[in-house]
Amino acid sequence: MKLIRSALTTACLLAASWAIAAPSPVKMEGKILPQEFVGQMTASERLKEYVAADETFERWTRLIGLRLQSAPQINNDPLKMAQNMAALARRQYPDMPPPNIRPQKDGAVVQFYAYQTGRNGFIESNVFRYWKGGEGLYSLQFARRSPLSSLDGNKAKDLASQNIALIQEIANVDKRQVEKALMLR
């Protein structure tokens, strides 16, 4: 559980990080996101995230995340990590629809919602694909954010439809592109 919280905390510390103009190695909804954030890049922990050119890492509508992490306590098991993320989402956001886990032959995909209330509140849909590699547990994340103020019945239906498409899209990404992007140079 500490590993999951660590991964989420790392993603939230974007404000203290740096960004460069390097395009995402994979597309989300047919688009390459050109602004890159490079987080920790060690032998066992690596993070790169991407947003649109006109957005910031504090305020974005689409995000692509690439990660490599070591999870020896679960033997770098992708399905177990997806189950752990789903359990964490259920605990933190019990009033949201339940997470959706889809096992795959080489890993697992999990989709869940998160939100932040308040003046700048938002709803966020996250889709993670996990697989085991020689260096540890890899993940690819597609996330979308919408202001809570814009959420009505139609927007909620649109979000649900987009999630189905993102789950299918992330399952078809060539994972070698992610692994190559996370290689230490």
Residue ranges and their predicted role:
Residues 31-73:
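Secretory pathway targeting signatures of secreted, lumenal, and periplasmic proteins
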Residues 20-27:
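Cleaved targeting-peptide boundary
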Residues 47, 105-112:
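Short, hydrophobic/aromatic-rich segments at coil-to-beta transitions
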Residues 16-17:
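N-terminal signal peptide c-region/cleavage motif recognized by signal peptidases
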Residues 27-43, 91-103:
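Short secondary-structure junctions
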Residues 62-104:
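Mid-chain, structured segments of secreted extracytoplasmic proteins
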Residues 1-11:
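Bacterial N-terminal signal peptides that target proteins for export
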Residues 112-184:
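Short, well-structured beta-strand
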